[in-house]
């Protein structure tokens, strides 16, 4: 691995440990030429997952899109950035664990909503209103009533 500071290709590992989620190994390295330290991560290469959109087009799963949707839904709500990232990671992990190469966008939306419902109901309703594309106030109210009745 090349040193990001001087480009030298040899280094020694100073420290090595698993990340919190045990999905990668964090290595602290020291360049043998300039002695500067830097961090690398080693993880299993993921199989790319294709998302089948509502119009039947396909695109690669992008965790940042899930995070951005959650950020909009959780705006001005007591939901931390870490909780948002945890939801996105849980959804990504759940899809990977299914060992599929394609997943419908509907399934992703449902997974996000289930996780969001546990954390903040207002953010859940906001996400659902965009995801489910409510046509009028009645369908919006039905969703809220379903949420209230499930308590």
Swiss-Prot record:
**Pfam families referenced in this protein's UniProt entry, alphabetically:** ATP-cone, Zn_ribbon_NrdR
Instruction: Please give a single GO biological process term from the UniProt record.
Output: negative regulation of DNA-templated transcription
Domain ATP-cone: start-end pairs: 49-139
* Key words, A-Z: ATP-binding, DNA-binding, Metal-binding, Nucleotide-binding, Repressor, Transcription, Transcription regulation, Zinc, Zinc-finger
| Cofactor(s) for this UniProt protein | Zn(2+)
Please provide, alphabetically and separated by semicolons, the GO molecular function terms listed in this UniProt record.
ATP binding; DNA binding; zinc ion binding
* ZnF region ranges: unnamed: 3-34
Q: Which domain of life is it from?
A: Bacteria
Cofactor: binding comment: Binds 1 zinc ion.
The family database entries (InterPro entries) matched by this protein are listed as: ATP-cone_dom (IPR005144), NrdR-like_N (IPR055173), RNR_NrdR-like (IPR003796)
Describe the family membership recorded for this protein in Swiss-Prot or TrEMBL.
Answer: Belongs to the NrdR family.
Role noted for this protein = Negatively regulates transcription of bacterial ribonucleotide reductase nrd genes and operons by binding to NrdR-boxes.
Q: What is this protein called?
A: Transcriptional repressor NrdR
- Report the source organism: Clostridium acetobutylicum (strain ATCC 824 / DSM 792 / JCM 1419 / IAM 19013 / LMG 5710 / NBRC 13948 / NRRL B-527 / VKM B-1787 / 2291 / W)
